[in-house]
Structures are given as C-alpha cells and as structure tokens.
C-alpha cells in the first residue's frame, strides 16, 4: 500500500464520520496519471464537493471532454478509500464511508439474456431505485441514452428526481437539455461542465462547477467540413429555445476563455 501510494502520489484524506461528505481537492484518475507520466504529459486535476445540500452533480459538455473520466475518478477514489488505500487527491480532501455504491457505466448489452443496451440500463435503474438510500453513491454515465431522446430524457429526469428524493449522492453525465435545466432549479441537484475552447474546439479537461455546458455539436460539425447547408437544415429542425440556449452556453464559454486569458 505504501509503494502504491508513492507511485500514484496518493494521500490520506480527512475521514468525516458524522456526515456524508465527498470533498475532493485536486483529484485525478490514478491510471490516467500513470499513463500521462509515461508519455511525459501533465494530468489536470479537478475539485468537487458533495454534501447534504448539494448531492447530485450533473456533468455536461462535449464528447471526449473528460465527463466520463471525472465520473469514474470520483467512484474509484471512494472505493480506494473504503479498501484502505490512499487516494489520488490533495490531503485536504474530505471523505466519508458510504454503504452502497451503484454504477452504470458503458454498454450493458447482453446477447445471452436478449437484452438491448437500453433495456439493460433500465434494469439497473430499477435496482438503483429499489436499493438506494441516503447512504448511497450512484454513478450513471450518459444517463438516458439508448432510446428516443425525448422519451429517454423524460424518463431519466423522473428517475433522477426519485434518487434525489432518496437523498442519495450521485454523479451523472449527460447531453440532455432537460437534465441541465432540472439541475439548475431543483434543490439537491447541481450542474457542472467540462470546459472547452470554443475557438479551437478542443477540450480543456477542466471541471467547472455550477453551470451546464454545451455539446458544441454544430461547431464541431462545421470544423470537420460538413456542408454548411446541412448544418443549417439541422438547426432548423430544433426548437428556437434549444438553439438559443446552446448559443448562450457557447457564448458563456467564450467569455470564460477570454477572462482566463486576461487573468494570465
């Protein structure tokens, strides 16, 4: 354990016994850290905090921006702690022991059982709802995908609300607008996004708490050289409210990038 801690540059967090708390300071995925170290690359850490008032984090943003690795890191560090290992985060981090840890990550399609990806995911959601409580942590990657976006998004919203009612702690990654809106007004649920350079259209791999992120779908399509008429036609298929919201998120990201440059 000591050798592993030294190799990973891991530390012992403060253990909170009388409260449910996950307060990670400069956390990073241990496997990503080792991979980047071998390649001479820097690993960008993140910070996040969960407590009785802010229990469920909804992470949005573009593909390949770091949403899934952030979710996996939070879950892995919790498991490392409960296995008696130091965690890859600053020693000022605070954590508590959690009784139940649930995860829905990756493609769960089963040929043997005749289950589609979405059916398999729904079975997991059913299990979560049956067993989750105030001493539970759930991790759901790409929540609601695998079905019709409107219907899948609506079902994901009511499931998330129910898990919130159970006072569970959780991390969800999504592209669904309705989940971002839910996190913006529902007590107990909060937004977070992976930062993205809106000019170069490259991910910054930084977690920003308190606001949703754009998926930059049309911007990426434009940069890849997809016909502009096709992009405009696709925009025309969306409601004006969705297009307006995505533009506002893009503009907010641009302003943040400019502000960061001024600070330097």
Language-model features: locations:
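ATPase nucleotide-binding head domains, primarily ABC-like/P-loop NTPase cores
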Residues: 6-262
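Extended, charged alpha-helical coiled-coil/arm scaffolds that mediate oligomerization and mechanical coupling
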Residues: 1-4
């Amino acid at each position: 354990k000591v050798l592993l801690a030294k190799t990973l540059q891991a530390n012992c967090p403060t253990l909170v016994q009388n409260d449910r708390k996950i307060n990670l300071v400069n956390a990073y995925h241990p496997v990503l850290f080792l991979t980047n170290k071998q390649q001479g690359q820097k690993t960008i850490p993140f910070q996040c905090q969960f407590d009785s008032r802010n229990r469920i984090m909804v992470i949005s943003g573009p593909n390949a921006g770091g949403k899934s690795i952030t979710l996996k890191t939070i879950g892995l560090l919790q498991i490392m702690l409960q296995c008696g290992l130091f965690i890859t985060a600053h020693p000022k981090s605070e954590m508590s022991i959690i009784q139940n840890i649930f995860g829905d990550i990756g493609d769960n399609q089963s040929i043997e059982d005749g289950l589609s990806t979405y059916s398999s995911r729904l079975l997991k959601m059913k299990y979560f709802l049956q067993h989750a409580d105030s001493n539970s942590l759930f991790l759901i990657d790409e929540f609601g995908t695998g079905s019709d976006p409107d219907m899948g998004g609506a079902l994901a919203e009511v499931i998330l609300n129910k898990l919130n009612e159970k006072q569970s702690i959780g991390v969800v990654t999504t592209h669904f607008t309705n989940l971002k809106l839910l996190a913006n007004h529902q007590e107990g649920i909060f937004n977070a996004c992976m930062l993205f350079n809106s000019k170069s259209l490259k991910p910054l791999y930084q977690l920003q708490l308190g606001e949703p992120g754009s998926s930059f779908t049309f911007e990426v399509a434009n940069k890849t050289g997809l016909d502009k008429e096709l992009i405009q036609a696709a925009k025309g298929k969306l409601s004006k409210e969705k297009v307006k919201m995505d533009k506002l998120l893009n503009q907010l990201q641009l302003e943040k990038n400019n502000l960061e440059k001024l600070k330097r």
